């Protein structure tokens, strides 16, 4: 009843309260019902006042809007604002389903897309970050194998390309912001067409043909696409005009140029004109081909180099590399090989003052020249005993071998051995003369144990004197001299032993013979002294005036411990003379072989 009174709007007592609606009452209160009806009425009113959207027309139904995109692609000014979703590897090189699966996979990854700008041109596709202006993707158009819009998302677009480094198929996906995926796909198709037209034009100009073999799924290309000029028509026409003007204009005679160099182009010309004017057009290229641009010749000419030390490049420079595992390529080895090929006498060492000398080459020169220079003392008269130096003085021929200005005969090993053989023959002749003189003196002098004045003209006595042992001690090589120097001088009192023929042996065998002869010279004085001990000791020699007999050069004779007997026919000397008189028999050249014949034998 209160409900009816309240609804009727009559007066209400203060103690009167509104009771809630029973639970079983259906529907909201009347006030709520009235508000809902008013809201619905207002929504209908608003919808009636709004403009209706035009009916959706797909992109394929309005191709007139894409004509501007084709021109922009050829000019390189076509761009679209997109969101770059990223790239993912795919298994196939083409197919719309492959692109759609790649878009789904990238969206499922939850990666944040990058707001960027897609530039489409006949050269390639470039994606530039809109905020940082970084180049995200730079794709050559020839590497793109497939592009398509997404059938599930109107603004999705993706393309498949071959990765240049890993050789895998990669799918790049985009979401267009203002345009649809179909428009982006159409622009990329225009880029394909422009690239194909450019390639066909190059094939026609360069004469390139490609033969495709279906059985081998390969093609063979003949010719080259490498043009040396720009690919745009404007550049080609400009190049044709320049060539026509250059052919029509008379050629100006250039000034005198340096030999081996083309006259440089003036610096006022542009780099393009330099390359076109300075480089001749090849006969095989067509008239439309522009020659490749090169650097000007004045930049390619060597300006100079620092050559402050010309002595370092000489043959005997001490700064050359001497240590190498390849011994045949060492500078010192090459120098020794080439020195034998030079005709005439070449000084091995430069005169003092230049300062350029090679220690290794000098040492080798001294060793080799010691054998070659041995013929100089043999040509003169045999040195007499009276001309020998004092006991403490060094020998003159030994010092002459170390002169820095000596010269070596630059010949082959055969010529070197021939000179050594001549020296040996000269020594043999000298020894024969000495033996003849000894025989004459032995027959004319009576066998008295006293020393007679007739012993002075002896050139090289072979008898068992103590002075002979002293002479050997004088000519023994010092510590600083190499042993090969000992047999090179004919002034020795004893011939070099063993006398092995030197013709036809190698230089190493010659050095070995020299060492053997130097080693066998030393035990002879002791042997001869032992032989001399068999004679009775004679009285001390005295001069007629009772004074010591002076030497012809003014120096006094050294004190002799025991007088030596007069030279007489000793069995050892007779055997030695018999061996010297025999002709030289050909013996094996190797001193280390076991079949050497016995020349002499010493009994102790």
UniProtKB/Swiss-Prot annotation:
Q: Which GO terms describe its cellular component?
A: cytoplasm; glutamatergic synapse
**Composition bias, Low complexity:** 246-260, 427-441, 542-552
Give positions of region: Disordered: 1-68, 223-283, 372-457, 531-604
Sites where Phosphothreonine occurs are at 279
The domain comment in this protein's record states: The PTB domain is necessary for the inhibition of MAP3K7IP2-mediated activation of NF-kappa-B.
Q: What is this protein called?
A: Numb-like protein
Q: Name one Pfam family in it.
A: PID
Task: Kindly give the PROSITE patterns that the UniProt entry links to this protein.
Answer: PID
Role:
Plays a role in the process of neurogenesis. Required throughout embryonic neurogenesis to maintain neural progenitor cells, also called radial glial cells (RGCs), by allowing their daughter cells to choose progenitor over neuronal cell fate. Not required for the proliferation of neural progenitor cells before the onset of embryonic neurogenesis. Also required postnatally in the subventricular zone (SVZ) neurogenesis by regulating SVZ neuroblasts survival and ependymal wall integrity. Negative regulator of NF-kappa-B signaling pathway.
- List the CDD domains hit by this protein, alphabetically: PTB_Numb (cd01268)
Any idea where this protein resides?
Cytoplasm
Question: Source species, please?
Answer: Mus musculus (Mouse)
Q: Where is the composition biased (Pro residues)?
A: 553-568
Source superkingdom: Eukaryota
* Assembly with partners or alone: Interacts (via PTB domain) with MAP3K7IP2 (via C-terminal). Interacts (via C-terminal) with TRAF6 (via TRAF domains). Associates with EPS15 and NOTCH1.
| A GO BP annotation | forebrain development
In which tissues does this protein get expressed?
A: Preferentially expressed in the nervous system. In the developing neocortex, expressed in postmitotic neurons in the cortical plate but not in progenitors within the ventricular zone.
């Amino acid at each position: 009843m209160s409900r009816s009174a309240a609804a009727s709007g009559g007066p209400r007592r203060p103690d009167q309260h509104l009771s809630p609606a029973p639970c079983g009452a259906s529907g909201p209160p009347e006030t709520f019902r009235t508000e809902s009806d008013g809201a619905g009425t207002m929504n209908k009113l608003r919808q009636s006042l709004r403009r209706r959207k035009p009916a959706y027309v797909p992109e394929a139904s309005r191709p007139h809007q894409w004509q501007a995109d084709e021109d922009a692609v050829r000019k390189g000014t076509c761009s679209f604002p997109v969101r770059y979703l990223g790239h993912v590897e795919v298994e196939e090189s083409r197919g719309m389903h492959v692109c759609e699966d790649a878009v789904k996979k990238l969206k499922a990854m939850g990666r944040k897309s990058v707001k960027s700008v897609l530039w489409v041109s006949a050269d390639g596709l470039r994606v530039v970050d809109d905020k940082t202006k970084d180049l995200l993707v730079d794709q050559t158009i020839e590497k793109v194998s497939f592009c398509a819009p997404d059938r599930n998302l109107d603004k999705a677009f993706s393309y498949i390309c071959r990765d240049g480094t890993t050789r895998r198929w990669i799918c790049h996906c985009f979401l267009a912001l203002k345009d649809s995926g179909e428009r982006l796909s159409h622009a990329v198709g225009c880029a394909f067409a422009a690239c194909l037209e450019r390639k066909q034009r190059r094939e026609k100009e360069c004469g390139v043909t490609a033969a495709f073999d279906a059985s081998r799924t390969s093609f063979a290309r003949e010719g080259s696409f490498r043009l040396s000029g720009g690919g745009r028509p404007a550049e080609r026409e400009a190049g044709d005009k320049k060539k026509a003007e250059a052919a029509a204009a008379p050629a100006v005679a250039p000034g005198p140029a340096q030999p081996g160099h083309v006259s440089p182009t003036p610096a006022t010309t542009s780099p393009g004109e330099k390359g076109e004017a300075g480089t001749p057009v090849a006969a095989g290229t067509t008239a439309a081909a522009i020659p490749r641009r090169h650097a000007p010749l004045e930049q390619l000419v060597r300006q100079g180099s620092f050559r402050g030390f010309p002595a370092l490049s000489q043959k005997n420079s001490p700064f050359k590399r001497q240590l190498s595992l390849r011994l045949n390529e060492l500078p010192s080895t090459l120098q020794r090989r080439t020195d034998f090929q030079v005709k005439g006498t070449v000084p091995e060492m430069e005169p003092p003052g230049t300062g350029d000398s090679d220690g290794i080459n000098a040492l080798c020169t001294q060793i080799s020249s010691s054998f070659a220079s041995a013929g100089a003392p043999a040509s003169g008269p045999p040195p007499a005993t009276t001309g020998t130096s004092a006991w403490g003085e060094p020998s003159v021929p030994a010092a002459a071998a170390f002169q820095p200005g000596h010269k070596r005969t630059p010949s082959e090993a055969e010529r070197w051995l021939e000179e050594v053989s001549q020296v040996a023959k000269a020594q043999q002749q000298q020894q024969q003369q000495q033996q003849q003189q000894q025989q004459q003196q032995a027959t004319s002098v009576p066998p008295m144990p006293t020393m007679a004045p007739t012993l002075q003209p002896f050139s090289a006595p072979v008898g068992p004197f103590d002075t002979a042992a002293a002479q050997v001690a004088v000519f023994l090589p010092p510590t600083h001299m190499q042993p090969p120097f000992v047999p090179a001088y004919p002034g020795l009192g004893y011939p070099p032993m063993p006398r092995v023929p030197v013709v036809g042996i190698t230089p190493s065998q010659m050095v070995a013979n020299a060492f053997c002869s130097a080693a066998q010279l030393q035990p002879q004085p002791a042997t001869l002294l032992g032989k001399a001990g068999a004679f009775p000791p004679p009285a001390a020699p005295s001069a007629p005036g009772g004074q010591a007999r002076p030497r012809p050069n003014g120096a006094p004779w050294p004190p002799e411990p025991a007088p030596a007997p007069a030279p007489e026919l000793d069995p050892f000397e007779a055997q030695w003379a018999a061996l010297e008189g025999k002709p030289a028999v050909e013996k094996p050249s190797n001193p280390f072989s076991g079949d050497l014949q016995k020349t002499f034998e010493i009994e102790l």
